[in-house]
Amino acid sequence: MFGIHYTSDVKLTNHIKQHRARLDLTQQDLAERVGVRRQTILAIEKGHFIPSTLLAFLIARELGMSVEDLFALSDEEVSAP
């Protein structure tokens, strides 16, 4: 099988809260701008929910960031099979 094998230790982290605060946006403000509920933004910020690719791009655009700068893998245990 081709592709990347992800171990269970790999987590997606984000810097949404910090960049949202920098722009003086509440969770509700950001949620309205990207078309989701405030609870969705909260869950993403806490790492309880991984956004779709589209939502990640929308959030990044609203925060003036690239997706790569806003989201990161917390562990480098990603390997090719």
PLM features per residue range, with description:
Residues N14, D24-L25, P51-L54:
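Residue-level signal for the short linker/turn that defines the boundary of a DNA-recognition helix
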Residues F2-G3, R61, F71-P81:
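Short, charged recognition helix plus adjacent turn
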Residues D24-A43:
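Short alpha-helical DNA-recognition segment
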Residues L54-D69:
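DNA major-groove recognition helix of helix-turn-helix/homeodomain DNA-binding modules
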Residues M1-R22:
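A short, Lys/Arg-rich alpha-helix, primarily the initiator
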Residues A21, E32, R61:
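Alpha-helical residues within the helix-turn-helix
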